[in-house]
Amino acid sequence: MKKSARLRIDSKGKIYLDVFFEKTEKEKKIEGEIIGLDCGYKKLAIMSNGDTIGKELQAKIEKISRKVQKSKAFNRALIERNEYINKELKQLNLDTIKEIVIEDLNNVKHGTKGKIRKEFNNKLQRWVYCYFFNRLEQHCEVVGVQLHKVNPAYTSQTCFDCGDVHRSNRNGELFKCRSCGYTADADYNASLNILNRFRPQVHMVPVHKNQLEKCNIFL
């Protein structure tokens, strides 16, 4: 890996060390599992294989929202949030994963995730998605995992079990199909739809009991 460095001083007298390097992209995996991944408001991400990371995300976002924008405390909270996301990403076990399917952020609009209503919180959440997906993309490149994007339309309202689409199917963190009665964590159900949208020819069997236990859904 070729490296070079440059020391520079900005107009305010701050000193920066810029490090440049060329890296060789790791060969993509040809064997392994393909999973869907959905970002939530209370959880950073939940996967179609049942794994969940970032269960303290909501607390981090709410901490930022209480700070005065552009203040030192606000900036510290942002740094803390980013460090938390980086730490949680390291907990994501990709040893047996060859491909990850996520939503295309270009199609995500205000209020499509959870029940965030205030404009500032909407911005905070979009920042989280952008930062997380950028870091995830970098992480995948390092370990040779392919990343795919699909249209997110109605993934949170569609029943993975029977295909019924209706906004009443989702109530906060709980998904309960009005048509067939299928019940699951809402983000987990969305992760299955995301994966199925990438591989529509394969209809997987959702993990009912185990997934409800993993996501702490009490019915």
Identify the role of each PLM range.
Residues 11-133, 201-219:
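Substrate-contacting helices/loops that form the catalytic groove of nucleic-acid
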Residues 3-10:
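Short amphipathic beta-strand and strand-loop transition segments with alternating hydrophobic
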Residues 2-3, 180:
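Low-complexity, intrinsically disordered Gly/Pro/Thr-rich segments
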Residues 6, 34-36, 74, 89, ...:
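Generic structural signal for short, flexible, solvent-exposed coil/loop and linker residues
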Residues 24, 121-123, 127-219:
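Positively charged, low-complexity nucleic-acid-binding target-recognition regions
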Residues 1-2, 103:
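Short low-complexity stretches enriched in small and charged residues
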